[in-house]
Design a protein with these regions (language model features):
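C-terminal amphipathic/interface module of NAD(P)-dependent oxidoreductases
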Residues: 3, 7, 263-296
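N-terminal Rossmann NAD(P)H-binding glycine-rich loop of SDR-like oxidoreductase domains
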Residues: 8-28
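NAD(P)H-binding glycine-rich loop region in Rossmannoid oxidoreductase-like domains
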Residues: 41-92
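Conserved Rossmann-fold NAD(P)-dependent oxidoreductase catalytic core, especially the SDR/UDP-sugar
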Residues: 91-133
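Conserved beta-loop-beta element that borders a ligand/cofactor-binding pocket
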Residues: 111, 144-167
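Glycine/proline-rich active-site loop of Rossmann-fold NAD(P)-dependent oxidoreductases
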Residues: 140, 152-154, 165-174, 209-219
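Alpha-helical substrate-binding/gating segment
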Residues: 176-184, 192-226
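Mid/C-terminal beta-alpha module of Rossmann-like enzyme folds, strongest
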Residues: 212-259, 293
Length: 296
């Protein structure tokens, strides 16, 4: 980033769980930012509409917006929304940035460890090949949608998020009610790997990637110690001081949630943040016990 220019970021999805944490860090560091809200004139990610006027005075873009992948069963219509809101929105931003007279220096986009698919015990790093399935295809299209910005010489960073842990939203918030009543348990056989990250570490990584010119390309945004679901279940029970003796059969998850349940709850993804650690990024919460203790 040009050190002579005061940074000012344009942020999509700024009111969401991750966006709110990112903007809080930016505020604490005195870094300016502007929100680009869905429905605002000149911005419709699902339709691929972006007016470059929003880039005036902007030095970088942090793109978080997209249809929630756990918002409902994956009907054909919902899958199209998940895909288009990410791919068309990212491409519109990248093309707008590439065409701007005063090009922003950096585009930071959210991505997902869903790229790796269901891999059992295999360890995945940024150099691993893609897996198979709907999420893999979404991520491949999503990341390549930023090519116009990359081709224009703009620094592009893709942060492949694992399960972002926060008591305020996302997966953990949905898990808490049954666990608090002592009705929690492992999913299926509990052997599937969960690649997770504390919300604060995820937000700090976005800010670091946005403000450090050395960050470029793909980074796995996960804690350095993934856990199997059975161990996560035990850690959550310990944090809440509740028993965890009610497993949820895999067949029930498939029956109730279909493909979404198989991909988000039963798939095993053991991902390591190899590039993030090589960059000397420091995790505040590298292990699941301390992360849950802080959150709960």
């Amino acid at each position: 980033m040009n050190t002579k220019t005061q940074p000012r970021f344009l942020i999509t999805g700024s009111s969401g769980l991750l966006g709110s944490a990112i903007t809080s860090i930016l505020d604490s560091q005195g870094i300016s930012w502007t929100a680009l809200h869905h429905g605002e004139e000149g911005w419709d990610p699902e339709s691929g509409v972006f007016d470059p006027k929003h880039l005036e005075g902007i030095t970088g873009v942090i793109h978080l917006a997209g249809e929630g992948i756990a918002a409902g069963r994956w009907t054909d219509n919902q899958k199209q929304k998940i895909h288009d809101s990410r791919v068309k929105g990212t491409r519109a931003l990248a093309e707008g940035m590439a065409a701007a007279d005063q090009k922003p220096a950096v585009l930071i986009t959210a991505s997902a460890t869903g790229f790796y698919g269901n891999r059992g015990d295999e360890i995945c790093t940024e150099s691993s090949q893609p897996g198979q399935g709907f999420l893999t295809e979404v991520v491949k299209d999503w990341e390549s949608a930023a090519d116009p910005a990359r081709d224009a010489g703009i620094r592009v960073v893709h942060l492949r998020l694992g399960i972002v842990l926060s008591e305020k939203g996302g997966a953990l918030k949905k898990m808490l009610p049954p666990f608090k009543f002592g009705l929690g348990g492992r999913l299926g056989d509990g052997q599937m790997w969960m690649s997770w990250i504390h919300l604060q570490d995820a937000a700090q990584a976005f800010v670091t990637a946005a403000t450090k010119d050395s960050f470029t390309g793909i980074y796995n945004l996960v804690a350095p110690h993934p856990v199997q679901n059975s161990d996560f279940t035990t850690a959550l029970g310990n944090a809440l001081k509740r028993p965890t003796v009610f497993p949820v059969p895999a067949v029930m998850i498939k029956l109730l949630l279909g493909e979404m349940g198989e991909s988000l709850l039963l798939a095993s993804t053991r991902v390591l943040p190899e590039k993030l650690e090589a960059s000397e990024f420091e995790f505040t919460y590298p292990k699941i016990d301390e992360a849950l203790k802080d959150l709960l």
